[in-house]
Amino acid sequence: MEYRPNDSITRAEITVIVARIQGQTGAVAQADTVFTDVPSTYWASGYIASATNQGIINGYGDGTFGPDDKVLYEDVIKMLMETLGYKPYAQNNGGYPTGYILAAQRQSVLKNVVGGAEGTEATRGQVAQMTYNAIDTPLMERYVYGGEAQYVIWDGESWSPRKTLMNQALGINKLKGVVTENEVTALDAAVQIDTDATQQIKLYVEDNYLGSNDTNSDYEVDSVYPFYTGDTNAADYLGYDVVLYAQDNKNETDTILSITEATGKNSKVEFTLDKFNSYDADTNNLSYMKNDTDKSATKLKLQTTSNRVNYSDSPAIIYNGIAYSGTLESLFGSYEGDESGLIYKDSAYSGKVTVLDNDDTSGYDVIFVDVAVGAVVDELSSRGVLTFKNSVD
């Protein structure tokens, strides 16, 4: 199915979207509506009836709804902000459409929405971006305290926890943290590989996006939790600071729906093995030559304070995808000219070194060394043992 972001969208289709982000994931039964042009047999009649009863949608005032009409930009905004509970705010700030547009702007529902103006048809791309923003927007709800009713925006600030359609209606947890383990290795040690198990990662949680006043989170900050990788490439983010969205599987391990690098984190430097220069144990600097014409090496400061992820005062080292159990000195040597490290043997092969700073605070936190050895098979024994030419082990 094609996305077609520049195509328009109908009033019935946006009504279904509004229902879905409220957690109505299954088919909604067809139902009678108050509109003369939406019979109970219409494919979206149940969604339209439900949204009408919630006060989210209105007709044209003549008894019709126009389900197949193209929806206007400001009508999408109104429906989304009504769904989020901002009707009182909008009515106190000019009503339709001004108050709803103001509410959407204040709550960043229009962030990254390209184009769009009152009186124009909304595009699928605009609706997708607004919906994406809306599900992670704090809900506004009527709250009674001390017998007095007031409206509260559940933004996680002050005394209130953070409530959104994402975590309240859709059962999706948003988390930020460092991937500390995949199905092959942790940052500090290899793991037992179970080929029959569902692939998992582990995440050191830095932020659960619920605010400091939430006491019911499944994920506590500064703790490590497992996640099924689902259809994502989450295992590739070992050592990286990420933001992930995971489907709440109730009392089971949650499944990742999406994962990306965290904004403003994960500074990294890559160089090929032949560009490696030295490691200085006294200064804890790793150096390499950026170019063949450089007269001096570029120095990279490695972390020297206790790491919140692997509880070590030196970087985690991942060698060909597996945690390296040796020291920095055993891998790189300990001073310029010291060629005792394993890296000097590997520099004869092709490969690269990636040095990652996942927190941008105290030096580089993770070192990835990837070595590829080219070899020609000389013999395959009856027992399945390979012998290579050129003395390759």
What label would you give each PLM region?
Residues 129, 139-393:
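Short, flexible, surface-exposed loop segments at domain boundaries
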Residues 126, 131-135:
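Extracellular, beta-strand-rich glycan-interacting domains
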Residues 1-45, 54-74, 80-121, 135-199, ...:
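Feature responds to low-complexity, polar/acidic, surface-exposed segments characteristic
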